[in-house]
Amino acid sequence: MRKPLALLALACYLIILVATSIWPKPVDGEGILSIITRELLNFTARTPSLDWIQYNELEAIGNVLLYVPLGIFLVVFAPRTKNLVLALVPVLVSLLAEGSQILFLPERYATAFDVLNNALGGVIGIFIAKSIARLRKNSK
């Protein structure tokens, strides 16, 4: 990915991440995300292999997926940074987001599980990006 395009993608992602994190009401409580959430839950309820997915599982999956791009962007913009340092960034970003919700957004629900799921998503993103970089390097 060329750097200007990567910067644009990063900016778009950060807008989504910040908006999702500091929206005053639960992001799935109203609007398009509530419709998507309801439709996904209806779909999982009608699909025998997915009927175990309830709201809490869907929220956890969403938290993981939300932070996967962060891990990817960390590797794109800081490829030589040690993995442990990279992995700490999603944890710190999530702690900042969840802490802000606790302090300033009384209608939001911040939990340790959110931090864990967000961190997991970041680590998955780091793993994906590092794996792709390794494959590209080995193919040359």
Task: Please provide the spans of the model-predicted regions.
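Bulky hydrophobic segments
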Residues: 1-108, 112, 126-140
